[in-house]
């Protein structure tokens, strides 16, 4: 695709019945024609307010209004970025400053940003209307119902931003173009899942998460399916309500959500025919629980820098403890610490990926940041090993590794050994603790599948006995802590940094004692 084009216009021209549903919201259904008319109307107003290339931060809950405003921004050549509406004020201000936003759109009760560089702020209407005008009528006058002046540009140019979750540092703005957006839509929605008109999609992850944005915002337009949008936070109770009322055929979740839905297995299984998990590796126990109930969960991994999922299990062929194969059009390879490609199976390395969803790069990137895209490959920072069949297994992240007495500790090796063979442990996380006299030592945090029948010391002894048979001694945990739940960020990803801080705090609070086991 070399001619100038506009992503919103391209999505509108896909050959689907305009009267079919595209979004479901608060018990109401919106057709493709209704949304298209509204987007064009809103674009005519935004064109009086914004110039092509202006950045717009959308800190809004999931709704048709958010999806339509996003596509209206792209229609006029503005560059929208959807962020978590629950972001702290400083985080929002930092993102607005980073992208030099001209406009911020927030929920009705959210304050305006202050300071000398504060952008114009619009607010959603109270009461959550089906389609919100965000006060544009009052600001720039009535809409032009005949507007069609799409801003067309190079298909490789940035047309929206996604900010990373910040799990590996400050959030970075990832640029996405028409070309790579259609690339990840085609690879995942069409080639992998074969989504089609009539499919009902429910993504529990929200649109501010790249995984959720593809599922809820883009795939309905791209595949002819329709999606449920929910402006409330996804508690297990709320998710159950949505499953019962909406009866989705395709469910997108993260491992923690599937774990929380175990008591509602009957309701989930009554309609869901295709379940997908991403965000963090799906534990073997979770895969096996749902498989025993007749539901195959396909695990996969994506990255904001690649738009969506690029490595996944195929429906009908999913395996436990496997992240699957590269999606059509993608290539993956593993490299060692020196950057040499690893050819042999069973050897661990850092995953590099290239393919149709690859981002053009970071917004205002430093040289160090942009180096992650060197040579047309994105360095994910994730550790994998590849088996003889070509399937990949996740082994953690390269920044999770640490040394004890000069020897590398691989946390996932310990974590998986525990979760596979000790059914009383639901989740396990190994992090380093800096001790006063002997440097870094491993600290283990666990959550339990069932309450302890005995004390924690006996649990620690069972863990030690099991690990001693298969794990090198320098990886054995020196402390054990049982938690009711593990900390996670807004995308459902494990917050290891919080656990490292907690481990240090607990160690220093309990000096001079060490756990005895």
Curated annotation (Swiss-Prot):
GO biological process: secondary metabolite biosynthetic process
pH-activity profile: Optimum pH is 8.5.
Record field: transmembrane: none
EC number(s) from the headed UniProt entry: 6.2.1.32
Gene3D superfamilies listed in its UniProt record: 3.30.300.30, N-terminal domain of ligase-like
Record-listed AMP binding positions: 161-172
Phenotypic effect of disruption: Mutants show no detectable levels of 2,4-dihydroxyquinoline (DHQ) or other quinolines.
PROSITE patterns: AMP_BINDING
Pfam families: AMP-binding, AMP-binding_C
Reactions performed catalytically: anthranilate + ATP + CoA = anthraniloyl-CoA + AMP + diphosphate
Biological function: Catalyzes the formation of anthraniloyl-CoA, which is the priming step for entry into the Pseudomonas quinolone signal (PQS) biosynthetic pathway. Also active on a variety of aromatic substrates, including benzoate and chloro and fluoro derivatives of anthranilate.
Subunit structure: Monomer.
PANTHER family (alphabetical): ACETYL-COA SYNTHETASE, ANTHRANILATE--COA LIGASE
Similarity-based family: Belongs to the ATP-dependent AMP-binding enzyme family.
Annotated protein name in UniProt: Anthranilate--CoA ligase
């Amino acid at each position: 695709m070399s001619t100038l084009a506009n992503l919103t216009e391209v999505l509108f021209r896909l050959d689907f019945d305009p009267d079919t549903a595209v979004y479901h919201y608060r018990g109401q259904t919106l057709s493709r024609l209704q949304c298209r008319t509204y987007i064009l109307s809103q674009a005519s107003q935004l064109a009086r307010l914004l110039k092509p290339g202006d950045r717009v931060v959308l800190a809004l809950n999931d709704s048709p209004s958010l999806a339509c405003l996003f596509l209206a921004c792209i229609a006029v050549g503005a560059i929208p970025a959807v962020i978590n509406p629950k972001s702290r004020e400083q985080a929002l201000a930092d993102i607005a400053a980073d992208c030099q936003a001209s406009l911020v759109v927030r929920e009705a009760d959210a304050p305006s940003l202050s300071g000398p560089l504060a952008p114009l702020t619009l607010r959603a209407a109270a009461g959550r209307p089906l389609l919100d005008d965000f006060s544009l009528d009052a600001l720039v006058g009535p809409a032009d119902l005949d507007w069609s002046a799409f801003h067309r540009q190079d298909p490789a140019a940035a047309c929206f931003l996604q900010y990373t979750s910040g799990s590996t540092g400050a959030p970075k703005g990832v640029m996405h173009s028409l070309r790579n957006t259609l690339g990840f839509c085609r690879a995942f929605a069409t080639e992998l899942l074969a989504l089609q008109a009539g499919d009902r999609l429910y993504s529990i992850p929200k649109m501010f998460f790249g995984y959720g944005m593809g599922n809820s915002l883009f795939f309905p337009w791209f595949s002819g399916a329709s999606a449920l949008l929910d402006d409330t936070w996804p508690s297990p109770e709320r998710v159950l309500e949505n499953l019962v009322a909406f009866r989705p055929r395709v469910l997108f979740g993260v491992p923690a959500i599937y774990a929380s839905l175990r008591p509602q297995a009957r309701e989930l299984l009554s309609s869901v025919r295709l379940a997908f998990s991403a965000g963090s590796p799906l534990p073997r126990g979770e895969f096996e629980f749902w498989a025993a109930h007749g539901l195959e969960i396909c695990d996969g991994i994506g990255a904001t820098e690649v738009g969506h999922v690029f490595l996944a299990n195929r429906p009908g062929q999913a395996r436990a403890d496997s992240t699957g194969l590269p999606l059509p059009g993608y290539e993956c390879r593993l490299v060692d610490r020196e950057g040499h490609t690893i050819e042999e199976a069973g050897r661990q390395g850092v995953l590099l990926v290239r393919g149709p969803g690859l981002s053009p790069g970071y917004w205002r990137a430093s040289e160090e940041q942009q180096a992650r895209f060197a040579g047309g490959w994105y360095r994910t920072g994730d550790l994998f090993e590849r088996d003889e069949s070509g399937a990949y297994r996740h082994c953690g992240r390269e920044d999770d590794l640490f040394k004890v007495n000069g020897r590398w500790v691989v946390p996932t090796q310990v974590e998986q050994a525990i979760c596979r063979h000790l059914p009383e442990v639901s989740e396990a996380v190994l992090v380093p603790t800096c001790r006063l006299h002997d440097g870094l030592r491993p600290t283990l945090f666990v959550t339990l599948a069932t309450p302890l029948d005995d004390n924690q010391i006996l649990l620690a002894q069972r863990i030690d006995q099991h690990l001693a048979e298969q794990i090198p001694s320098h990886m054995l945990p020196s402390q054990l802590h049982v938690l009711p739940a593990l900390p996670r960020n807004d995308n459902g990803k494990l917050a290891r940094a919080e656990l490292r801080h907690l481990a240090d705090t607990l160690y220093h609070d309990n000096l001079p004692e060490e756990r005895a086991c």
